[in-house]
């Protein structure tokens, strides 16, 4: 059983792991600046948030409040999409304080906390926990999944996404400090080992997968003279026209998943798991 962490207040935010709040060892601090600046114009962020909002809505409790925790909320872009959902009691968490400063600025009424999910648990038990593109940054992902399980009520739901397929590994994974990309079997096995049953699993970024594969192969052969910050921005920013086209194509993925399809391959893996 993991320890329940104690907090100190830093910049008006409860910090349960203040010793790592400004370390940025598992994610570049410039990533928060880029996300806050570009999230609303990114086809990937928009599509991901639409899909995950629909999944969260489908798992709300039929009566009373649903207690919700986002692990790795970053600048709060997803919470901005769900903030107005009735009877959803939201907590956002992030290991690095810079993301939370942006999140608190964008959503001053939301409860945000800083903590390292590998070190223990915080707060009350939750009905829904999300971790979108988080555990691939964590060396000890089993510790993170174990603590997430302990923070869920019985039959509580974890909605998790991770980058998929190690053959897609590229400079971008290195810049954002990924430890791994997952296979479906690897993530499912780790979830089952930490007291989860699998409700649903699907790939995402399915329609755009051929373009993603080509871009990753091209990236491997490219000289890398740019700084990590410049390299990150170059790889995640697209023209307005391309963003519009890609956003339209991503809606095909979203529609298929909402219909219950389990897409066989894609750049991202999405799993809905239930605590035993």
Model-derived regions, located:
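Conserved N-terminal segment of class I S-adenosyl-L-methionine
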Residues: 1-132, 142-145, 239-240, 252, ...
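A C-terminal cap/extension of S-adenosyl-L-methionine-dependent methyltransferases
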Residues: 2-4, 41-42, 122, 208-276
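Conserved S-adenosyl-L-methionine
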Residues: 196-206
